[in-house]
UniProtKB/Swiss-Prot annotation:
Catalytic residues of the enzyme: C131
Naturally occurring in which organism (per UniProt): Escherichia coli O139:H28 (strain E24377A / ETEC)
Name listed for the protein in its UniProt record: Acetaldehyde dehydrogenase
CDD domains on file: ALDH_C
Quaternary structure note: Interacts with MhpE.
The encoding gene: mhpF
Domain of life: Bacteria
UniProt-recorded Gene Ontology molecular function terms: acetaldehyde dehydrogenase (acetylating) activity; NAD binding
Pathway in which the depicted protein is active: Aromatic compound metabolism; 3-phenylpropanoate degradation
GO terms, biological process: 3-phenylpropionate catabolic process
Catalysed reactions, as listed in the record: acetaldehyde + NAD(+) + CoA = acetyl-CoA + NADH + H(+)
């Protein structure tokens, strides 16, 4: 099966890590162009050393390159504001081009591969939510397939060193996009997301805490669902793991808790603690937040490439 050519816009931490993953592990993808805006960026320099065509003139530079004619899929690892402009420009030049959005812009539907990739494989633009979303939404979905989820709250703690300027500029968008995706993809009636940039030295690995309030259900069934979901995520993010056993607390009807925006709640509280270790393709292993974003985007693009190849075969 012929490989589909891809470009990456954004030569920062996420874009560079993704490029290395495609070059090393791409099965149906061929790395064609790395796009940046800083001619001195490490990502562009590394791309050139690895034999990848580059431009430092942004999306306009990409569209002016001869390689652009053959590109089927573009990853955007810039910022939420830039992605809106990039999508418009690329869509005008190539209406059927596929965009995988690694910013919180969310023009297209949210995609968390283990939960809803099959439903979104033919979309022209998919949004990879956020690193916190990719790590925690599978856990919310694991509970919601067993019991009705009224509220889910996630806290993502990442090493400050792993957060580049794009991540820092998009903190508000991070919380908004993740909260919404907890509801839309995770199945919670109400979602909340919190991000912590941990300045500790040496840097600590990505840690995520997930609290889910649901109708009462079998705790064994919920724990089994969570363990099964964690294994499914590990298929494309090997460093993803439960830090300890799932914890449960029954909130009785005569002692309900009051949730802002939700009201009185009684039922089952499920607590999940996660750790995400990075594959250290570009940044060290503590940057699991980068790894889960780039691994999820890669898994999505691989499925898209297979779908495009099948369609091309059917058309022929």
């Amino acid at each position: 099966m012929s490989k589909r050519k891809v470009a990456i816009i954004g030569s920062g931490n996420i874009g560079t890590d993704l490029m290395i993953k495609i070059l090393r592990h791409g099965q149906h993808l061929e790395m064609a162009v790395m796009v940046g805006i800083d001619p001195q960026s490490d990502g562009l320099a590394r791309a050139r050393r690895m034999g990848v065509a580059t431009t430092h003139e942004g999306v306009i530079g990409l569209m002016n390159m001869p390689e652009f004619a053959d590109i089927d899929i573009v990853f955007d690892a810039t910022s939420a504001g830039a992605h809106v402009k990039n999508d418009a420009a690329l869509r005008e030049a190539k209406p059927d081009i596929r965009l995988i959005d690694l910013t919180p812009a969310a023009i297209g539907p949210y995609c968390v591969p283990v939960v809803n990739l099959e439903a979104n494989v033919d979309q022209l633009n998919v949004n990879m939510v956020t690193c916190g979303g990719q790590a925690t939404i599978p856990m919310v979905a694991a509970v919601s397939r067993v019991a009705r989820v009224h509220y889910a709250e996630i806290i993502a703690s990442i090493a400050s060193k792993s957060a580049g300027p794009g991540t820092r500029a998009n903190i508000d968008e991070f919380t908004e996009t993740t909260s919404r995706a907890i509801e839309v993809v995770g199945g919670a009636a109400k979602g909340k997301a919190i991000i912590v940039l941990n300045p500790a030295e040496p840097p600590l690995m990505m840690r995520d805490t997930v609290y889910v309030l649901s109708d009462e259900a079998s705790q064994d069934d919920i724990e089994a669902s969570i363990n099964e979901m964690a294994e499914a995520v590990q298929a494309y993010v090997p460093g993803y793991r439960l830090k300890q056993r799932v914890q449960f607390e029954v909130i009785p009807q005569d002692k309900p808790v009051n949730l802002p925006g939700v009201g009185q709640f009684s039922g089952l509280k499920t607590a999940v603690w996660l750790e995400v270790e990075g594959a250290a393709h570009y940044l060290p292993a503590y940057a699991g937040n980068l790894d889960i974003m780039t691994s999820s985007a890669l898994a999505t693009a691989e499925k898209m490439a297979q779908s495009l190849a099948r369609k091309a075969g059917e058309a022929a």
